[in-house]
A protein has these predicted regions:
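Short, well-ordered beta-strand segments in beta-rich or mixed alpha/beta enzyme
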Residues: 6-11, 20, 46-78
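Long, hydrophobic N-terminal alpha-helical segment
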Residues: 1-34
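N-terminal low-complexity, charged segments
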Residues: 21-56
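An amphipathic, aromatic/His-enriched active-site/gating alpha helix that lines ligand/cofactor pockets
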Residues: 33-44, 65-112, 123-139
Length: 139
């Protein structure tokens, strides 16, 4: 199983602090459904950090993800659709993103083995059924 471990920085558009507050509250207030979307993306860990640096606001995404999950843009989940709306309103596209380079990735063997088992289960249920959309959208 191939894992991607990322830490990426994005700049928030000027004047969007209150909207970012709303965005983070939305994700926290809908955590059960938010976690379901992560399963479909094979996203095992996702954490959002926030920082003010030299008077500018930034959001950082830390993630641990296996290959082969659905892309957020392909999701039918209301969580993902709303997340994309907030993203487009709040994230400054002129800044791009800054990916920090991992130097050491430390995942204890029992945790890695659990992720491998989840990866196998995902492939057996989602991929082998020939689904092209998130299972959440099929219910």
């Amino acid at each position: 199983m191939q894992l991607t471990v990322e830490l990426s920085r994005f700049r928030v558009k000027e004047g969007k602090t209150a909207k970012v507050d709303e965005w983070m509250a939305f994700l926290n207030n809908h955590m059960k459904d938010t976690l379901l979307t992560l399963e479909n993306e094979k996203m095992y860990v996702e954490t959002i950090f926030r920082e003010i640096l030299d008077g500018r606001e930034y959001l950082y995404w830390y993630s641990v993800q296996a290959e082969g999950g659905i892309e957020i843009e392909d999701s039918e989940s209301y969580i993902d659709k709303k997340h994309i709306e907030y993203w487009e309103e709040c994230i400054d596209p002129s800044y791009g993103m800054v990916d920090l380079t991992p130097q050491v990735v430390m995942i204890p063997k029992p945790v890695y083995e659990t992720m491998e088992e989840l990866d196998k289960q995902y492939d057996e249920t989602f991929k082998k059924r020939g689904w092209t959309k998130s299972p959440m959208s099929l219910s």
